[in-house]
Design a protein with these regions (language model features):
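Short pre-active-site segment immediately N-terminal to the catalytic Zn-binding motif
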Residues: 1-7, 54-57
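Non-catalytic terminal regions of proteins
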Residues: 1-4, 96-219
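Catalytic Zn2+-binding segment of zinc metalloproteases
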Residues: 10-27, 73-78
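Generic structural signal for hydrophobic core residues of well-folded globular domains
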Residues: 11, 15, 73, 85-86, ...
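Generic helix-packing signal
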Residues: 16, 70-74, 176, 210
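Metalloprotease/metallohydrolase-associated module, dominated by Zn2+-dependent proteases
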Residues: 41-102
């Protein structure tokens, strides 16, 4: 289940496409404040947005929105998964640099003022006023849950309701990363593959317990 974290990012692309968020952003912010988005630094060095075609700006905008959409539910787990899977990459025609993607998500999560976050909030607010989007702005994720106590004892975590599901995924990913880097307790001496498999199994069992309880309650 933890490997499904990138699906939050992909869902962000769907929301963006269906609501026209990036298309509205390019109309209003492409030529503002040197392009608003972080100026890309590719193999040839830093270039100005004014010298680049619109499709590159739009591609970068879509990726930043999908990252922020994901962060609303699973915090920094989305971009951390990206970093661990693909490493740090410079900007390309299709994607911003990994460094800038992580920075924007971290700024959002830490309430640090960021022009990209401000841009999306302004666009979302405009669409909200038109009745096209329910939320008036990007929203911070729920606080992390204490999965450590149960996972340290190799037991499934009790998820109280659906609202906790996203926070549970986020918390479980953070727990997995911690035990990967510095195994403690029962995880000491195990390979990263064994740690990942066991924690993923615990996550799956935790989610399945919720599904079973709901099914029984509906009968």
């Amino acid at each position: 289940p933890l490997c499904s974290t990138p699906l939050y990012h992909e869902l962000g692309h769907f929301v963006d496409f269906s609501k026209g968020i990036s298309e509205l952003a390019i109309l209003n912010y492409r030529s503002v404040n040197q392009g608003t988005l972080p100026i890309p630094k590719g193999p040839q060095g830093i270039v100005e947005w004014a010298t680049l075609p619109d499709f590159i700006w739009l591609n970068h905008c879509k990726e930043f929105f999908a990252d922020l959409f994901s962060a609303q539910f699973v915090g920094k787990s989305g971009v951390e998964f990206l970093y661990k899977l693909a490493g740090s990459h410079p900007a390309s025609d299709t994607h911003p640099s990994t460094e800038n993607r992580i920075k924007i998500v971290n700024d959002f999560l830490n309430n640090v003022k960021n022009p990209v976050v401000d841009m999306f909030n302004a666009v979302i607010s405009a669409l909200h006023k038109q009745g096209k989007i329910i939320s008036p702005s990007l929203t911070l994720p729920l606080n992390l849950l204490d999965v450590k106590t149960t996972f340290d004892n190799v037991r499934p975590f009790v998820i109280n309701n659906h609202n906790e599901m996203h926070a549970f995924i986020n918390s479980s990913w953070q727990y997995l990363c911690t035990e990967w880097e510095n195994p403690t307790g029962i995880w000491k001496g195990l390979s990263k593959e064994s740690i990942e498999k066991t924690i993923n199994d615990l996550v799956e069992k935790s989610i399945r317990n919720v599904m079973i309880l709901e099914k029984w309650s509906a009968q």
